[in-house]
Structure formats: C-alpha cells, structure tokens
Amino acid sequence: VCPAAITVATAIARRLAGFGGAALNFDYAIGEGGVGDSLQAVRRHGKHGVLQDPGLADLSAHVDFGAIARAAREAGAVVHGPMPQGELLERLGIQTRAEALKRRATPEQSADIAAAMERLLDLQQMGTLFKALAMTAPGLATPAGFL
C-alpha cells in the first residue's frame, strides 16, 4: 500500500463528501486483496528491465484500489468499483463512438482507431490490467457505467 495514495484518496473523498462532486480514477491496478511486488518498467509499449536504461523507461506499479476504496469510504465518499477499464468503456459506449469516428476517417485513421480500441479493451492489454474507480458525494446518482 502506498501511504501517499491513501492520503490523496482521503483528501479527495473528504472534499467530495463536504462540497459535492465526483472523481474518476483509471490506473494500472489490482482490485481487492491483491498483494505482491508489481514494480515494472515499460519502454516502447513493451516490458523492459527495471534497472536497465534509467530514465528511458516508464516505471509503474499496481495501484491498490481496494485500499483506496476503503480509505475513501472511511472519509465519507461513496465508492463505485473498481471495475476493469474495458468493461466500463464498453458500458459507456466506446464501440458506438469508435464506429462514428471511423465513418469519417481515412483508412489509416480507421486502422489507428481499431488498434487503439484493441489496446484499451483487450483482456490481455489495458482492458483488464487497468481498473476504474469512481468516488462520489453521498446522495449523488451512481455514475454512468457503474450501474
């Protein structure tokens, strides 16, 4: 668990509970109960050695959305999720939006849209590796996609 992430989530949740509003978070994450070392490096969209080429690769680790959700609830916010990014985007109509974009796209743009959709939704890519978590003020409707 990252103490700074809990501090930030608590501050956001308190603000939402006190003043209203909503927050939507997407990140490379685990859900409830995940434990372990998830530090990794990514370079040019591929796995890379964590200590190889310092400064030239992006370092990341799974966010513990379960811990963030607990902290947000304790601070007074209503928590929705976490859920896989792909599932949320599907519920929000990403397929319909992509088809609308493709109707006015060049063949090259259409191929780019298809590739982006695969990356965002595929179960082996960002579709399940990334999670979505929403926090809302008490009394607000459940955010679209989280119903």
PLM regions: where:
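Long, Lys/Arg- and hydrophobic-enriched amphipathic alpha-helices
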Residues: 1-147
